[in-house]
């Protein structure tokens, strides 16, 4: 199995204020799979995503990628792995304001020894004609496309998406979801997406529903639908 999550536990605080955010999660995600993590606020989905990405550490349990445990990696190797093999897309775009679209994407390319072709990616993103613009000259959707480009140009094994459409309107959200779908299908990256939008589950290969720090449902979609057909 490509991504193996075993017995992951995480809590915050101590004593009477201690909150168990993750309560012993087990999950397998296949290479190239599009997995959606669903759940209400406080269910632990973003914390799980951060642990997969090495941003936070678990209190107990293990995460292995292609058989290698993240906990066994020394800090330098873990940092290199995050830079080279993980791509992050957040609700906030976090673009470098004084760099153009192209330059923002090239920042990601510099971190990889196997980057995608920037020109080809700009065409895929629908940004080729906007590549010389600065972030403040872009719409919200264009800024998020640029952020996706910066994440995917590294050709990461895993693309981690935390509410990537949370700050966007309906039409722009669908465009971004179609783009992430295209990236997953074209480049074969494993996608793990956190969302509170229940409709997005219908485009996923795997759906994992969390509540109170536990997995309540975990199933594969037999008849997933394209992002363009989603409605909410």
For each feature predicted by the language model, list its residue ranges.
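ABC family nucleotide-binding domain
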Residues: 2-204, 209
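Conserved beta-strand-loop-alpha-helix hinge in the C-terminal portion
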Residues: 214-232
């Amino acid at each position: 199995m490509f991504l193996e999550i075993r017995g992951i536990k995480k809590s915050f605080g101590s004593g009477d204020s201690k909150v168990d955010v993750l309560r012993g999660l087990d999950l397998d995600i296949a290479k190239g799979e599009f997995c959606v993590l669903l759940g209400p606020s406080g269910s632990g989905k973003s914390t799980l995503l951060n642990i997969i990405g090495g941003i936070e550490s678990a209190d107990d349990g293990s995460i292995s990628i292609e058989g290698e445990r993240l906990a066994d990696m020394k800090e330098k190797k873990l940092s290199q792995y995050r830079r080279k093999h993980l791509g992050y897309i957040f609700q906030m775009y976090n673009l470098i304001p004084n760099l153009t679209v192209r330059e923002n994407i090239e920042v990601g390319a510099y971190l990889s020894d196997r980057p995608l072709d920037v020109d080809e990616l700009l065409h895929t993103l629908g940004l080729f004609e906007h590549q010389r613009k600065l972030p403040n000259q872009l719409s919200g959707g264009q800024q998020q496309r640029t952020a996706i480009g910066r994440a995917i140009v590294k050709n990461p094994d895993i693309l981690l998406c935390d509410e990537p459409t949370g700050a966007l309107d309906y039409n722009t959200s669908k465009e971004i979801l179609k783009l992430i779908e295209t990236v997953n299908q074209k480049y074969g990256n494993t996608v793990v997406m956190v969302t509170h939008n229940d409709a997005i589950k219908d485009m996923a290969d795997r759906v994992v529903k969390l509540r109170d720090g536990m997995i309540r449902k975990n199933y594969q979609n037999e008849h997933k639908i394209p992002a363009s057909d989603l409605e909410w």
